[in-house]
């Protein structure tokens, strides 16, 4: 097969481009943010590869698959089936963890279900089989007169109608069964839903415990019959209501008398009722009423501080006031005393209950007061509507489940070992440690590692698969992750590398892989491993296309496609395509930075007059020295943080660095940000463990600026997000034409009826639903894509209709509204951040992550600064070209000049050079990280021998 040839691509801003991508090569697509890289790689190449593959399937199969729109391209030849590995997080599924995403969990369940050695959760001794005689002996110890029933399980959690099973039970002479917990005579069993899981137990015998020989004979016969019917398993239920006893010919503890089900892979699944912790349902965490949320303002007096009590109905408030008055009298505290000044022991009793110390009237009887948290829980349970219940959820936080300690599994599953390790212990290990563990037992698979007569020979293929998948995770630089880590806590870059490891594990050949910036989140140290993996993917006979800005990745690529010259309407052209050597000689913006003609490092870091530095005009960087005020967080121990204390100088530009997994996000995002959000905004998310936080009084706002979209619908656009669309509508409403017709500002909105085109609902396009084909969007024939009706478009401001103004670029609008100071100021901030090329009415869904981030920064710059704001950014250079990074640095330093504090998690060496203060965590990832290697200005980091970051600086 020949190369992949693209001719006449016009998706989004692509200008009828022709591109050649050599087959079985590693190709890098680069260019400015918004120049059309994703439009070419994902919306053209991947979309067409995926579409052609899906079209080859039957119409029946196609209806179940997401179908991609046909890209606007004249011809693509030589295309292979395409797989996109995008840089996105996993979504919010709380059950998704690293082990489930990589499918390692399935193999672990198979391993532990096949050769695991069960131990008693109470005493820890290995579980042994029980004979019928041992079971009878145990039951004979029941007190005389105890009524009990012997059940034999025949169906356990299986879907189906089970009609044949019920017929077989009747043939065997039994008359009663228990189906899904309810007991029926066999003739009266209701028809079972074949789509639902059911459990069926045969009622073998009903007995009353006595000491005569007839009872012993009957009990022995019933136990033997039950074991035969239930496949070696019986359940004995005490009619008095005690917990049922499970007896097994296969698994039982000789000392505690506890019996266990036979081990199966589902016993280790937290998504199955047979393996999940009964307390948290397999989630690993539970919601609880949090004292800090119930009493958000601890400076208020006792009579006013309990927030949910103050928001109850009039009668309830009177009742709770009476409770507080009695408590105050008995414990001799004043209702006017601020909550924070009450004794700690009293506060604990007030929240959690007074036991028998304090008895209060409660309906018809006197009861001890169970505490404020219990009363709020009851208020929630008794709420008459979902809306009322949701209000009480605001007082809840979540914490690890106290029953399973966050492991998600039931006690019996947590006590099963292979080679001395439980599945919980294996899942809690970093990937590199679990890889070493499984390689160790793989080497002695024929042995009996537990000394209990179980060899690992039957599962050597399972072990091989586990080792292979762990090896791929290790190779993509994720050796620090634990298998039980929640997917929602992973960054987009980590998630992408997990998907990459899964793809390499699949061993496919002849596939087109399209990746979106796989180096995101990687310290320069880890890049080499990733590049080696992409080469391995290529060498197997696949074509790998990578959207990337990393110079090292470009240097090792076989082919480079450079788009430009600008972004948005000014981009979309191929500036260069060919090998690395040719790019260095090309006249493109990318080449200017790669060969040193331009540099990101600024001339003056203290000034907002931030120009790109020429190589022959290199000047030293002048940093802003830290002042006397610091934000100091002490004793951080969440995840792998080793009890560290970190100082952030206020009013400076601080960069947090360290290799992947060193604890950067844990420190800044999970600990510092969450605690500040709780203190300033009463947010619910619990912060990571730390001892103290000082200096918060010097901060009045915390703003996180990420690369998430500014809106997820076609109606969202820069004009509505930054907030000047309402100003434009006001201007139109003041024109003579609008006044004569009685139009207000609402007439010029495409979100409300009146001025918008009702045929398309103000979208400008109409969706045509095609059975078995992807939906097609066509320009609205009524308004011609202009969104407004004819009457609204007749009103002009400065000779332009509202639709014509929304079609302008930001730069054009800035010139047009130059004499409207309020509007011009907001538009100028967008021009200053390098977004003069985007359209005012451009759909938010077409903006890149870098563009969305710069719009958010422009919005912040357009607001009046208090000089006490803390800005948090996690890897803001994601998706940014060298030139975009220079613009971003100018913006961040502008925020700093207003007296604000900017904290950035970043691996980009040029960003580190511009920092006033660097906090370097490490020295490694996972267990080898979590230490403060050094902190201080860049010079101090350079001189620190232990710092990997210092070497790259």
State the predicted function of each range.
Residues 1-953:
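Conserved phosphate-binding elements of NTP-dependent enzyme cores
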């Amino acid at each position: 097969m020949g190369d992949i040839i693209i001719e006449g691509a016009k998706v989004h801003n692509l200008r009828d481009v022709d591109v050649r991508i050599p087959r079985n090569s590693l190709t890098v697509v680069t260019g400015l943010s918004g120049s059309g890289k994703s439009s070419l790689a994902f919306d053209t190449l991947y979309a067409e590869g995926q579409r052609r593959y899906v079209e080859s399937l039957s119409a029946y199969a196609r209806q179940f698959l997401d179908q991609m729109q046909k890209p606007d391209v004249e011809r693509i030849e030589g295309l292979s089936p395409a797989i996109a590995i995008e840089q996105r997080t996993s979504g919010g599924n709380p059950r998704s963890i690293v082990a489930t995403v990589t499918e390692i969990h399935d193999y672990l369940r198979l391993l532990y279900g096949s050769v695991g050695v069960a131990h008693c959760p109470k005493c820890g001794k290995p579980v042994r089989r029980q004979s019928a005689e041992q079971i009878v002996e145990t039951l004979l110890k029941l007190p005389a007169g105890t009524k009990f029933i012997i059940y034999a399980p025949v169906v356990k959690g299986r879907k189906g109608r089970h009609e044949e099973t019920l017929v077989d039970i009747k043939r065997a002479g039994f008359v009663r069964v228990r189906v899904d917990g309810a007991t029926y005579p066999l003739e009266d069993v209701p028809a079972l839903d074949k789509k639902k899981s059911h459990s069926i137990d045969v009622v073998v015998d009903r007995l009353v415990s006595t000491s005569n020989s007839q009872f012993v004979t009957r009990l022995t016969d019933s136990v033997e019959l039950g074991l035969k019917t239930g496949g070696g398993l019986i359940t004995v239920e005490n009619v008095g209501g005690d917990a049922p006893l499970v007896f097994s010919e296969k698994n039982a503890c000789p000392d505690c008398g506890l019996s266990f089900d036979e081990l199966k892979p589902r016993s280790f699944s937290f998504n199955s009722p047979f393996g999940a912790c009964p307390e948290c349902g397999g989630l690993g965490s539970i919601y609880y009423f949090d004292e800090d949320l119930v009493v958000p303002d601890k400076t208020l007096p006792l009579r006013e501080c309990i927030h949910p009590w103050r928001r109850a109905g009039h009668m309830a408030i009177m009742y709770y006031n009476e409770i507080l008055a009695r408590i105050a009298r008995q414990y001799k505290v004043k209702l006017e005393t601020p909550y924070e000044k009450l004794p700690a022991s009293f506060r604990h009793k007030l929240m959690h209950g007074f036991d028998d110390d304090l008895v209060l009237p409660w309906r018809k009887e006197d009861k001890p007061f169970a505490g404020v948290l219990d009363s709020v829980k009851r208020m929630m349970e008794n709420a008459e509507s979902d809306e009322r219940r949701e209000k009480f959820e605001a007082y809840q936080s979540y914490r690890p489940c106290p029953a399973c300690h966050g492991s998600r599994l039931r006690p019996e599953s947590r006590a099963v070992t292979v080679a001395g390790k439980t599945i919980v212990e294996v899942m809690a290990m970093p990937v590199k440690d679990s890889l070493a563990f499984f390689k160790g037992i793989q080497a002695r698979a024929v042995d009996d590692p537990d000394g209990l007569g179980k060899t690992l020979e039957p599962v050597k293929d399972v072990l091989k698969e586990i080792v292979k998948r762990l090896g791929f995770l290790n190779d993509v630089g994720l050796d620090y992750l634990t298998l039980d880590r929640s997917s929602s806590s992973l960054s987009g870059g980590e998630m992408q590398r997990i998907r990459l490891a899964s793809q390499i594990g699949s061993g496919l050949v002849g596939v087109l892989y399209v990746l979106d910036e796989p180096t995101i989140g990687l310290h320069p140290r880890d890049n080499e491993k990733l590049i080696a993996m992409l080469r391995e993917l290529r060498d197997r006979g696949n074509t790998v296309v990578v959207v990337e800005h990393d110079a090292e990745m470009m240097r090792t690529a076989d082919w480079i496609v450079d788009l430009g010259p600008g972004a948005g309407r000014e981009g979309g052209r191929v500036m260069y395509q060919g090998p690395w050597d040719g790019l260095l000689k090309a006249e493109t913006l990318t080449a200017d930075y790669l060969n040193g003609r331009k540099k990101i490092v600024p001339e003056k870091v203290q000034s907002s007059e931030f120009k790109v530095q020429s190589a022959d005009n290199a000047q030293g960087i002048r940093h802003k020295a830290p002042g006397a005020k610091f934000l100091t967080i002490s004793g951080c121990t969440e995840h792998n943080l080793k009890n560290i204390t970190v100082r952030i100088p206020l009013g400076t530009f601080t960069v947090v660095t360290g290799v992947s997994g060193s604890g950067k996000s844990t420190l800044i995002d999970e600990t510092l940000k969450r605690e500040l959000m709780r203190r300033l905004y009463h947010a619910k998310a619990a912060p990571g463990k730390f001892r103290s936080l000082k200096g918060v009084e010097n901060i009045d706002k915390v703003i996180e600026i990420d690369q998430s979209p500014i809106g997820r619908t076609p109606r969202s656009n820069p004009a509505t997000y930054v907030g000047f669309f309402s100003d434009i509508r006001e201007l139109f409403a003041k024109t003579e034409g609008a006044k004569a017709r009685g139009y207000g500002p609402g007439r010029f909105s495409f979100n409300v009826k009146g001025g918008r085109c009702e045929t398309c609902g103000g979208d400008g396009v109409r969706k045509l639903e095609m059975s078995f084909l992807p939906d097609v969007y066509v320009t609205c024939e009524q308004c011609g894509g202009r969104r407004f009706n004819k009457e609204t478009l007749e009103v002009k401001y400065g000779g332009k209709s509202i639709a014509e103004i929304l079609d302008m670029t930001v730069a054009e609008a800035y010139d047009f509204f130059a004499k409207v100071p309020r509007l011009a100021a907001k538009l100028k901030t967008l021009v200053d951040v390098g977004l003069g090329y985007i359209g005012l009415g451009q759909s938010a869904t077409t903006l890149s992550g870098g563009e969305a981030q710069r719009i958010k920064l422009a919005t912040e710059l357009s607001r009046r600064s208090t000089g006490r704001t803390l800005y948090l950014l996690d890897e803001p250079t994601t998706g940014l070209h060298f030139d975009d990074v220079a613009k971003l640095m100018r913006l961040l330093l502008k925020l700093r000049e207003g007296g604000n504090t900017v904290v950035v998690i970043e691996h980009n060496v040029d960003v580190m050079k511009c920092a006033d203060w660097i906090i370097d965590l490490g020295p490694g990832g996972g267990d080898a990280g979590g230490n403060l290697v050094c902190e201080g200005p860049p010079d101090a980091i350079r001189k620190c021998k232990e710092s990997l970051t210092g070497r790259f600086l």
